[in-house]
C-alpha cells in the first residue's frame, strides 16, 4: 500500500484528519501582555494575576506617570506606560477601559493596535436605583464595536466575569472561574484561552464568535445582582467540559 492509498478511505475518498484536541493550546508564556485601562480595578487586577503567573505585563493609561505608579505598586516586573506605548510594545492587548471611553480610546490607537491580538473585556452597563442593566451598543456589543474600529487588529473578547476584588487580593491564590472567550479565528481564541489558563484556577472556554458577545457582556449585570444579594464575588463555571 502506498502512502497515497493510506490517506484514503475504502471508498477512495480522502481520509479526514483527526479532530484537534480543544485543550491542546499554545504556549503563550513568552508573549508581552499590555492592559489598556491598567490603572482601573479590573485592568489592574488582571495585570497583577498575569504578572504573578510569570507573564510580562505592561499597564497603560492616558497618563504615563499614573501607569508607572500603579506598576510599581503591583510589582512582579510590571511596567507602566501611556496607552500608545503600551499598545506598540505588546503582543496581546487587553482592553479594560470604562465603556464611556471605549470607542474614543480604540479609535485613537488604531495604528498602534494594527496587527495586534486585542482582547476586549469591557461590559456596557447602565445603573439606576434598581441596579445594573445591560446596554446595547449600536454595533451589537463592545467587542463588535472594537472590531469595527480596529479593522487591522485581531479582535477577541474575554475576561468579562471576573471580580476585581478577588483579582487584586494577594491572599487569594486561585481564581475559581471559567473565562468565556469569543473570536473569529480559532488560533486567536486559543491564544486567549491559554492566557486565561496561566492564572491558577482559571480555564479559557471557547464561547462562540463575536456576534455572541452581547449576551456574554450583558451577563455581568446578572452577576452584580447575585453579588449584591449574597454578598459574594460570583464567577462562572461551565459544566461537562
Whereabouts are the PLM-identified features?
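NAD(P)+-binding Rossmann beta1-loop-alpha1 motif at the extreme N-terminus of oxidoreductases
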Residues: 2-69, 73, 198
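Hydrophobic Val/Ile/Leu positions in short beta-strands of Rossmann-like dinucleotide-binding domains
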Residues: 35-36, 95, 181
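General beta-strand structural signal in soluble alpha/beta enzymes
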Residues: 80, 154-159, 204-207
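Active-site-lining helix/loop region of Rossmann-like oxidoreductase modules
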Residues: 177-241
Amino acid at each position: 500500500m502506498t502512502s497515497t492509498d493510506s490517506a484514503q478511505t475504502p471508498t477512495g475518498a480522502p481520509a479526514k484528519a483527526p479532530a484537534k484536541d480543544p485543550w491542546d493550546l499554545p504556549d503563550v508564556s513568552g508573549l508581552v501582555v499590555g492592559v489598556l485601562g491598567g490603572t482601573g480595578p479590573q485592568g489592574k487586577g488582571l495585570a497583577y494575576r498575569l504578572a504573578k503567573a510569570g507573564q510580562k505585563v505592561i499597564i497603560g493609561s492616558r497618563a504615563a506617570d499614573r501607569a508607572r505608579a500603579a506598576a510599581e505598586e503591583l510589582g512582579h516586573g510590571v511596567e507602566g506606560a501611556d496607552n500608545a506605548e503600551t499598545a506598540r510594545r505588546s503582543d496581546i492587548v487587553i482592553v479594560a477601559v470604562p465603556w464611556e471611553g471605549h470607542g474614543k480610546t480604540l479609535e485613537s490607537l488604531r495604528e498602534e493596535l494594527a496587527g495586534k491580538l486585542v482582547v476586549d473585556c469591557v461590559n456596557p452597563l447602565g445603573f439606576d436605583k434598581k441596579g445594573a442593566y445591560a446596554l446595547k451598543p449600536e454595533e451589537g456589543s463592545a467587542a463588535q464595536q472594537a472590531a469595527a474600529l480596529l479593522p487591522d487588529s485581531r479582535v477577541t473578547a474575554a475576561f468579562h466575569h471576573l471580580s476585581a476584588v478577588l483579582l487584586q487580593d494577594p491572599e487569594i491564590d486561585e481564581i475559581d472561574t471559567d473565562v468565556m472567550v469569543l473570536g473569529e479565528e480559532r488560533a486567536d481564541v486559543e491564544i486567549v484561552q491559554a492566557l486565561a489558563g496561566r492564572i491558577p484556577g482559571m480555564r479559557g472556554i471557547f464561547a462562540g464568535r463575536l456576534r455572541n458577545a452581547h449576551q456574554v457582556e450583558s451577563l455581568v449585570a446578572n452577576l452584580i445582582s447575585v453579588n449584591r444579594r449574597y454578598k459574594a464575588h460570583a464567577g462562572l463555571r461551565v459544566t461537562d467540559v
